[in-house]
Amino acid sequence: MTAGRDPVAVAALQYCAAGTAEETLRTLMPLIDRAADDGAKLVCLPEAATFLAASRAALADEAEPAGESTVLDRLCNAAARRGIELSIGSMFFLKPDGRHVNRHLLVGADGRICAQYDKIHMFDADVGDGKSYRESHYFAPGDEMVRADSCGMNMGLTICYDLRFPHLYRRLARDGAEMLAIPAAFTFNSGKAHWHVLLRARAIETGCFVVAATQCGTHADGRRTYGHALIVSPWGEIMAEASTDDGNAAAGANDAVIHAALDPHAVTSARTAIPSLGTQPEFS
């Protein structure tokens, strides 16, 4: 139902996470304040929101145990201080078995954690940038889809590489999602070819808003991320977009906060015009 619901003021952040949380927070906290100052009620952070480690050993040193994160506490306090919801695109936590999880967290305006989602699809790929990515060597995959209320809209929580698996998003939409949070740290090579196409496709085929906060720049491990934080309408139109990294920009030059007002009525309108969610046959 959309009757009587007002548009939601959403911001998506773009920046280049450092190799440690402490250094990243010096960039991130002012961006959160900037988004709140500009009127955002929901602020979305990218994948690897607090750090992108230079090595597996550095990941082990920097990641905190789940449930004992002082860095997460600081972000929760920021949400409460500004009276905003935070979609923390992902943080890396240490599990008791020694493995890590890549976890997307939704924090309410009271600073409490409302929902959490562990990344299901591991990025094991070679995208032609001279690096080999094997997330399955570092992280334990999740196994549950997650939706949650965010500012009166139903949000589907996902992370980065999940974007390439459309069945996940159709299921989230059919179960009630109106907004899809797709935080990312897309590599430059794959982003240049696929980023816009994939995000707009997910919006069009689900009739959902897509909010994609993203990393942008060259990180401690040498990877270069694409940027272009995006907010996409249920009709597949780009509502807001940040710039990309040209490879030579000064540190912080590509940091950005983009904004859009998400009107729940646009979801109803798109799905009424093209009712594909309700007409797809089941295949055996």
Language model: regions and residue ranges:
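Beta-strand-turn-beta hairpins that frame and shape the catalytic cleft
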Residues: T2-V10, R147-G156, M179
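Cys-nucleophile CN-hydrolase/nitrilase-fold catalytic domain and related Cys-dependent amidase chemistry
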Residues: A21-E22, R26-D110, Q116, T187-C208
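Short beta-strand scaffold segments in enzyme catalytic cores
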Residues: I88-S90, R103-L106, V146-A148, A229-I231, ...
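Active-site catalytic loop in hydrolytic enzyme cores
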Residues: K95-D175, F188-K192, V197, S269, ...
